[in-house]
Curated annotation (Swiss-Prot):
Keywords: Amino-acid biosynthesis, Arginine biosynthesis, ATP-binding, Cytoplasm, Ligase, Nucleotide-binding. It comes from Bacillus pumilus (strain SAFR-032). This is Argininosuccinate synthase. GO terms for cellular component: cytoplasm. The gene is argG. The keyword Magnesium does not apply.
Length: 403
């Protein structure tokens, strides 16, 4: 391989990607590290410097929290994306954004390749590589961890030999990924689907036994499907989600224990914490119920399921995803209003909703004297609505008589 070929590495600061810097150098590459802040709470300045210490020639630290919130989490919210009905797509949402930034840095640096730290067993390798190829088919994609196939002990030996710092949390049994939409946790005792997750597996949510005994009421304002304020206070979308993570998390909202079907064909037990996401998803759905006509409200879940599958399966940049985005955007035009939510003992309970575009007419719905519904019109409607069933019954009875 000729010298001075650049590769842009998605760098997390952990053992795998730190070792990958040195390993890629041994393959003849100059390594440019790319560190993204998508709301995981890490000290990104420290991670940026660590990349340089372990041998990267350049280290980018990109604050992508607001872009992640506006372009990725908001789509997940408006599409109510819950993979297999339970998983709000925490990690799956950040991967296309990370891929996008890797490609942008690679093009800026005239790199010939990008690299990630995924193993050959998970979903993320697919999400990264499919996204990268969709954005720039000319870039080579390298997967050092998948290629070297070392055991943990062999990796540690390599790190010590090359003076690479060993993370202090290396003994943790868990594999954790976090962004502002939530936190995922796997491995260790969680690999046993019968074992109850220990409290040490959680970080964003309070155990139910320790949550406040008094509920907290909040009001969330939406404008065209986008949450903009809590209790009348305006927030950027990223700050709003992070604030809700804290508020709802204190009440134990958003714990999810799920055995899911991975893209690569295996089942995996995952524990998720998504206090802000779960609260927003419930509030947004209730506002849609108030403002969408029945036909749209009944059809939209079909789109939502497909959208969740596309995102989970790494097809964010696919043509179908783009087409579904257009439908989704159209459905949000009147999803404006305020939703009142009670947070209590692990639950986010919607207790009220209002909108200038509300399709709920109290005078039509009421059973009091104010009722304006035309009851006489019901007779003709029922006759026409049931006509096909009635005709079918008449015809079949005639045939039975002939027999």
């Amino acid at each position: 391989m000729s010298q001075n070929k650049k590769v842009v590495l998605a760098y997390s600061g952990g053992l795998d990607t730190s070792v990958a810097v040195k390993w890629l150098q041994e393959q003849g590459y100059e390594v440019v590290a790319c560190c993204l802040d998508v709301g995981e709470g890490k000290d990104l300045a420290f991670v940026q410097q660590k990349a340089l210490q372990v041998g990267a020639v350049q280290s980018y630290m990109i604050d992508a929290k607001e872009e992640f919130a506006e372009e990725f989490a908001l789509t997940a919210l408006q599409a109510h994306t819950m993979y297999e009905g339970k998983y709000p797509l925490v990690s799956a949402l950040s991967r296309p954004l990370i891929a996008k930034k890797l490609v942008e840095v690679a093009e800026k640096e005239n790199a010939v390749a990008v690299a990630h730290g995924c193993t050959g067993k998970g979903n993320d390798q697919v999400r990264f590589e499919v996204s990268i190829k969709a954005l720039n088919p000319d870039l080579e994609v390298l997967a050092p961890v998948r290629e070297w196939k070392w055991s943990r002990d062999e990796e540690i030996d390599y790190a010590q030999k090359h003076g690479i710092p060993i993370p202090i949390n290396l003994d943790s049994p868990y594999s954790i990924d976090q962004n502002l939409w939530g936190r995922s946790n796997e491995c260790g005792i969680l690999e046993d689907p019968w074992a109850a997750p220990p409290e040490g597996a959680y970080d964003l949510t309070t155990p139910l036994e320790k949550t406040p005994d008094t509920p907290e009421i909040i009001e969330i304002t939406f404008e065209k499907g986008k949450p903009t304020a809590i209790d009348g206070i305006q927030y950027s979308l990223s700050d709003l989600i992070l604030h809700l993570n804290e508020v709802a998390g204190q009440h134990g909202v958003g714990r999810i224990d799920h055995v899911e079907n991975r893209l690569v064909g295996i089942k995996s037990r995952e524990v998720y914490e998504c206090p802000g996401a779960v609260t927003l998803l419930k509030a947004h759905k209730e506002l849609e119920d108030l403002t969408l006509v029945k036909e749209v409200a009944h059809f939209k879940p079909i789109v939502e399921q497909k959208m969740a599958e596309l995102i989970y399966n790494g097809l964010w940049f696919s043509p179908l995803k783009g087409a579904l985005d257009a439908f989704l955007q159209e459905t949000q035009q009147n999803v404006t209003g305020v939703v009142r939510v009670k947070l209590f003992k692990g639950h986010a309970i919607v207790e009220g909703r209002k909108s200038p575009y509300s399709l709920y007419d109290e005078n039509l719905a009421t059973y009091t004297k104010a009722d304006e519904f035309d009851h006489d019109a019901a007779v003709g409607f029922i006759n026409l609505w049931g006509l096909p069933t009635k005709v079918n019954s008449i015809v079949n009875k005639k045939e039975q008589v002939k027999a």
